[in-house]
Amino acid sequence: MPGPIVALTVDCTCALNGKCYVSGIVEATEQAIVPCTWLLGVSEHDPMSNVKLYHNEYLHRIPAWHEIGLYLSFDTGASNTVDRGDLIRVGKDILKQFSIKPTAFRAANGDLEAGDIKALEDIGILVDSTPGSSAELPKDAPRSPYHPSYTHPYQKGEAKLWIAPVAHVNGVRGYIDQGFDVLKAVIDAHLTLSDILVLGMTDCVDNRENLAHVIAYLKQKGARFTTLTQLVSEL
């Protein structure tokens, strides 16, 4: 029986948090020869800091076969879809200044609205991984990748982009920051629901040891590791 398909993702916001553990994540993934999707943070009140930091200090350390995507914070809680669409385009344009064309996306704090779906498609996003990345996830939300509705991002529909939700079980999200023991329970429970597993982590937490344990555990299960965009391209 084939093992699970796994996408590891990193929320890259360390410029705003004062601590950055990119090197440990790179080390763990290189030692295990697995790719990762790095989602570069752009925030409404400080759009450039994270991208500049990564460009100057870290992008040259991340293997070319990893993926670079966009992580966007709607800081003011703007509810007007036109304003949010403008922010999505700003995020794309900032990454474009550094020769990055993102096709993977995540909104901070699970803040994905229906009007965002079309705006994401318009800038070339192929896969969103917002659902499951925060504390809240509707119980009836799909656990495997799906095409969302244009009117409800947590329901299946006719949108062109995919949503690849982060593993989320009994109110616990699949983030490596929480430690291997917590994550092992999430992984085991999620794999009873889907053989596709998306896990998250943040770059402001020292995840090297936890990540190495998670990768080793999943390899024992015969897991195949991929990036978010490659994952949905195979569906």
Ranges and model annotations:
Residues P2, A32, T37, K184-L235:
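C-terminal domain-boundary segment and adjacent tail
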Residues M1-P63:
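Active-site beta->alpha N-cap acidic-glycine motif
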Residues A107-S194:
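Active-site-adjacent pocket scaffolds in enzyme catalytic domains
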Residues T9, G69-L70, I125-S129:
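Glycan-processing catalytic domains of CAZymes
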Residues P35-G115, P131, A135-P138, A159-K160, ...:
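Metal-dependent polysaccharide deacetylase catalytic core of the NodB/CE4 family, i.e.
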Residues G18, E113-I117, N207-L211:
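Short, well-ordered alpha-helical microsegments
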Residues V22-V26, H55-L59, G85-K92, I117, ...:
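Generic structural signal for well-ordered alpha-helices
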